[in-house]
Amino acid sequence: MNELKQKYQDEIVSSLMDKFNYNSVMEVPKVEKIVINMGVGDAVQNSKALDSAVEELSLISGQKPMITRAKKSIAGFRLREGMPIGAKVTLRGERMYEFLQKLVAVSLPRVRDFRGISKKAFDGRGNYTLGVKEQLIFPEINYDKVSKIRGMDIVVVTTSNTDEEARELLAQLGMPFQK
């Protein structure tokens, strides 16, 4: 079992129960899934760009990404409905905890001028969205093989009802929030 999951079960559940006065263990919020999304705007002109993005996303997540397609045609972007324009991965279970641990311990500290992540990126329902400017912060990505620096969105979906509960859960899991 992943050590982050073990820590959640052993320490975090009891600490959150004390802090928020839950009656049952089932009320305690937990991380449900992590969605990593990479929008590839270049894919309209250059189909090879999407292939490299899919390859990088599969290296980062350890799982095959799903290709996302355009919902509408937009003439200004030379975009037709159904064209592939990005890739996303949904992580659950063991892979989710492994990715979260890697993100907190290895990847986020590698960001240049890193002073912690914003406390304001919660959506009001207890989900946290994090934007990453470059994929090079992940140790699996080889700098020499990168054709273009791309960012990605990482959404951490929790079962908590309020942002305060989710913030406490993520902070105890080791997310480095700004002071």
Curated annotation (Swiss-Prot):
It comes from the Bacteria. Keywords: Ribonucleoprotein, Ribosomal protein, RNA-binding, rRNA-binding, tRNA-binding. The keyword ATP-binding does not apply. One of its GO terms (molecular function) is tRNA binding. GO terms for biological process: translation. GO terms for cellular component: ribonucleoprotein complex; ribosome. This is one of the proteins that bind and probably mediate the attachment of the 5S RNA into the large ribosomal subunit, where it forms part of the central protuberance. In the 70S ribosome it contacts protein S13 of the 30S subunit (bridge B1b), connecting the 2 subunits; this bridge is implicated in subunit movement. Contacts the P site tRNA; the 5S rRNA and some of its associated proteins might help stabilize positioning of ribosome-bound tRNAs. Belongs to the universal ribosomal protein uL5 family. Part of the 50S ribosomal subunit; part of the 5S rRNA/L5/L18/L25 subcomplex. Contacts the 5S rRNA and the P site tRNA. Forms a bridge to the 30S subunit in the 70S ribosome. This is Large ribosomal subunit protein uL5.
